[in-house]
């Protein structure tokens, strides 16, 4: 689908209304530092003659400026997608970027009015905390996710899955497991929901084929889905900065040393470097109380594509 210039101009004007500086906090998310940005600009603290340069303050203000515009960009791309496509769907794995998108969709009102549907694939091998967390954010934001799982198995019925496909399928044939538990339910979910625009959390920092993605991709000629990549220009640090700024509900495994998560069978936390603490689930690097504790560089590097998963 192609949009005329007037549509984009209208969307751009509307996006300003949703700028973080104009955001009214609700119980769904509390902006802790939006006051740092006023009237669309931030005054940087430059050192006067004889005064010491406050580097930490400068960095904090610079990060706030960056995050402000990243938010505006992300909300603009979501608004264009949800307002111009009747069936925008967000496949949500509840990783850090996904909870940010969930919060942005809430701020725009698209979870409440149904202009964006949330889709979740339950592989039956997720961490127990993952589906529990889904129930929490459904209650928190007031939406109901569309959950899909292996074909021919009732949602949430692990015993039925084991009986039909075998509890050890992933050990015996990992390619078949991926097809049965991930690929087929994902594709079926998009088709069932009549998806014409897929919202996702892909970002350039993940590299490889994602290194040059833009915030929006038109549907391929001949068929396919349009894609909205609201976090295309975000780093993982930006993502956690946003979670901290608005106190966004996030996966409990972050507090146990997991920068990212997938199936429990093949996701590990950051290993502890303390010989007195051999348990990797008690590593000293984690996200807790709205901040990264431990080696921040290690945390963000370990969460990169194909690491720790």
Indicate residue ranges for each PLM-predicted region:
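N-terminal chloroplast transit peptides
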Residues: 1-31
